[in-house]
Amino acid sequence: MKNTDPVANTKIYLATSFFNEEQRARIPQALAQLEANPTVGVVHQPFDFQYKDARVDSDPAGVFGSLEWQIATYNNDLNAVGTSDVCVALYDMDQIDEGICMEIGMFVALHKPIVLLPFTKKDKSAYEANLMLARGVTTWLEPNDFSPLKDFNFNHPMAQPFPPFKVF
C-alpha cells in the first residue's frame, strides 16, 4: 500500500538572505505558501530566533556582530539545520550570499533534501548556475514563483535536479 496521504509533520528550514528590502519581502510570501501546505508542520525561519533578539535594526543587548553573537548565531543555525527535515532556500541568484550557501552545504552534507526557489531579474537564458549548487540541490523550482511551495509534497520530496539555467 502506498502512503501518499499528506501529513503535516515536516519541519522546514527556510534559508534566505536578509540584506535588503526585496529579500526581506520574500519571507512572508514564502511563509504564506508553506503555511497553506498540508505536508508542512513547522517552518523554522532563523530570523525569528535571533540570539538575544539582536538584529541589524535593533540590538537591545548590544551584542550584534560581536564574537559572542557570531558563535551563538552559527550554533543556533547549525542546530536548526540538524533538526529540520527539508531546506527551502530562497536563493538570490543576482546577489550571492555566502551564508545561504553554507546552509545549503550543511543540508547536502547531512543528506537532507533542498528545494531551491531562485530569484533573478535576468532572463533564464542569460544566467549560469555554478555546478556545485546545481548538483547539490534536490529540487529546483522555476525562478521567482512562490506558488509551488503550497502544493509541494514535503513528506516525500521528489527530485527535480535540473536547474532552469545553464550550468557551468
UniProtKB/Swiss-Prot annotation:
Protein family according to the UniProt entry: Belongs to the nucleoside deoxyribosyltransferase family.
Pathway: Nucleotide metabolism; nucleotide salvage pathway
Species of provenance: Limosilactobacillus fermentum (Lactobacillus fermentum)
Catalytic residues (UniProt): E103
Listed Pfam families: Nuc_deoxyrib_tr (PF05014)
Protein function: Catalyzes the cleavage of the glycosidic bond of 2'-deoxyribonucleosides and the transfer of the deoxyribosyl moiety to an acceptor purine or pyrimidine base.
Reactions it catalyzes: 2-deoxy-D-ribosyl-base(1) + base(2) = 2-deoxy-D-ribosyl-base(2) + base(1)
Signal peptide stretch: none
Name of the protein in question: Nucleoside deoxyribosyltransferase
